[in-house]
Amino acid sequence: MADRGPWRVGVVGYGRLGQSLVSRLLAQGPELGLELVFVWNRDPGRMAGSVPPSLQLQNLAALGERRPDLVVEVAHPKIIHESGAQILRHANLLVGSPSALSDQTTERQLLEASQHWDHAVFVARGALWGAEDIRRLDAAGGLRSLRVTMATHPDGFRLEGPLAAAHSPGPCTVLYEGPVRGLCPFAPRNSNTMAAAALAAPSLGFDGVIGVLVADTSLTDMHVVDVELSGPRGPTGRSFAVHTRRENPAEPGAVTGSATVTAFWQSLLACCQLPSRPGIHLC
C-alpha cells in the first residue's frame, strides 16, 4: 500500500460495524496507508457529531467524486442489490452483506460490472471459520456436504417475511433448515455467515450448502456458529469430516458479535493488499 500512496476508502453504512471501521480508519488509517474519503448512511443524522462534516457523503450516487479505491458496504443487502454494480464503476467493492449474492440477478450484475470496469468484488468472510480450508477442499473436488448452523437469542434476529411471523414455542427452536438461498431473503442480516460458506464452496453454492437458523433463549450474550462438512471416503469407507463451533460474544440483541468486528477489519486490510482482479473473491 505504501508504494502507491494512500488507499482511498469509502464506508457505506454507519451502524455498529460501520462505526467501528470509521473509528479505526481515522485513528490507524494514516500509518497503514489508508485514507477515509467518505462515509454514507441512509440516515445522515446518525453521523452528526462523530463523522467530520467533510467526510459525510449525502448522495451515494456521487461517490465517484471522492475518487475511492475501495468502497466498503456494511449497511444492508439492499445497497448491493441497488447500487453494487454502480459502485464497481468507480472502485473495488468489499461486500459486508454477502446474503445479497443469493439473488442470482445481483450476482450476475456484479460479475458483469466487475469484468467491464476491471474492479474486484471482495466478500468479507465475517464469522465463517475455516473459509480457506473449505475453499481448498471444494477446489480439489472433495467437498461432499456443508452445513452451517447459526444460533442466538431471538432478540438478535432481524427477520423478514414468513420468518418474521414465526413463533418460538420453546427455549430452543429451529426457525429454518434448508438451502441457504431460501434463507437469505428472509434473514438478510442473520445469514451472512452461511452466504460466505456458499461462496467458499461454489460446487455446492447457495442451493447445496444447508443453512440452519436457531432461536435459543439461553444464548443471551453470544452467537454460536457450527460448521459441519464431509469430504471424500477413505479406504475403510469412513468419510472425512470436520465440525467447528464458534462462540462469539455479543451484546444482548446485537446482530454483529464482537469477534466479527475484528475479523471484518482484517478483511478490509487484506483486500487492500490483494491485486484488483475482476471476479468475486472471499477475503
UniProtKB/Swiss-Prot annotation:
Positions where Phosphoserine occurs in the chain: 20, 168
Taxonomy, superkingdom: Eukaryota
UniProt keyword list: Phosphoprotein
Biological process, per Gene Ontology: NAD biosynthetic process
Single GO term (MF): NADP binding
A UniProt-annotated Pfam family: Asp_DH_C
Transmembrane annotation, as ranges: none
Database matches in InterPro entries: Asp/hSer_DH_NAD-bd, Asp_DH, L-Asp_DH, NAD(P)-bd_dom_sf
Family (UniProt): Belongs to the L-aspartate dehydrogenase family.
PANTHER family per record: ASPARTATE DEHYDROGENASE DOMAIN-CONTAINING PROTEIN (PTHR31873:SF6), L-ASPARTATE DEHYDROGENASE-RELATED (PTHR31873)
Protein name: Aspartate dehydrogenase domain-containing protein
Organism: Homo sapiens (Human)
